[in-house]
Design a protein with these regions (language model features):
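Beta-sheet repeat architectures centered on beta-propellers
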Residues: 1-248
Length: 248
């Protein structure tokens, strides 16, 4: 009734996890269906945006091309062409704030859609052409509504009665750009993905095992949290935490 979409993930050992998905502002999910297609069963939702109802297909998180990893926006338009600072065809998002995402480029937003188009502060895609990236001959960009991904671990089961402080959060990621970690969603530290050997291009999607050092307060539950606050790709394969133990 509240328009929030629910999803369930079931592991091979019958473990079950639930998640909820909220869309932009006062928009509401109305219904959901699984539609057989050539390569996979597509997830299609009916969503009310303002006075209109749209059918939207959720993008696969196993895209064939790396450029399509950046389809991390809702109700999106896919642009393919020369580097540009103006994107049109967005009349369905007039009056909304959108983001523009592309490989090797920082995400641009929030940007107000007016007259069915949006303009970025600079040309998207010009940076990697200036760097001589021969793999990039055409810009592929996505323009749409951003969403935030949040994950929080359960209480540390061991020694429940002792005080715990989270000192380090470790996670394994696949095709990830940008992430924050901490003792909770109010105290997060960014994953510093760039190194001194990097070019000036925006960091690309990485497959890595990462450790983020945090300064957690003493608490009884010993939880940890992750957040992806920008519309950038991330697949989390595993999460762990390091705790200091103390007496109550």
């Amino acid at each position: 009734e509240d328009g929030v979409l629910l999803s369930m993930t079931r592991g091979a050992n019958s473990q079950v996890a639930w998640a909820q998905h909220e869309t932009d502002g006062s928009d509401r999910f109305l219904s959901i269906a699984s539609v057989p297609s050539t390569d996979e069963d597509a997830v299609v939702v009916a969503v009310r945006r303002g006075a209109s109802v749209y059918l939207e297909r959720m993008s696969s998180r196993q895209p064939q091309l790396e450029v399509d990893l950046y389809s991390c926006v809702e109700s999106a338009l896919r642009y393919e062409g020369a580097p540009t600072d103006t994107f049109t065809g967005l009349s369905h998002l007039n009056g909304r704030y959108v983001w523009v995402t592309a490989r090797n480029s920082p995400p641009y937003g929030p940007l107000l859609v007016s007259g069915g188009q949006v303009t970025t502060p600079e040309e998207v895609g010009a940076n990697y052409q200036a760097a001589g990236d021969e793999d990039e001959t055409t810009l592929v960009a996505y323009i749409g509504l951003a969403y935030v991904g949040e994950l929080e671990l359960l209480d540390a089961a061991r020694q429940r009665l002792e005080q715990k402080a989270v000192t380090r959060v470790g996670f394994e990621v696949d095709s990830a750009v940008g992430l924050e970690a901490g003792q909770d969603l109010e105290h997060l530290v960014p994953w510093r993905q760039r190194t001194v050997a990097d070019s000036y291009l925006y960091p690309g999607a990485a497959n890595d095992v990462v450790q983020v050092y945090v300064k957690g307060a003493w608490r009884q539950h010993g939880r940890a949290a992750l957040r992806q606050s920008k519309p950038l790709p991330v697949t989390i394969l595993g999460v762990t935490r390091e705790l200091e133990m103390g007496e109550m």
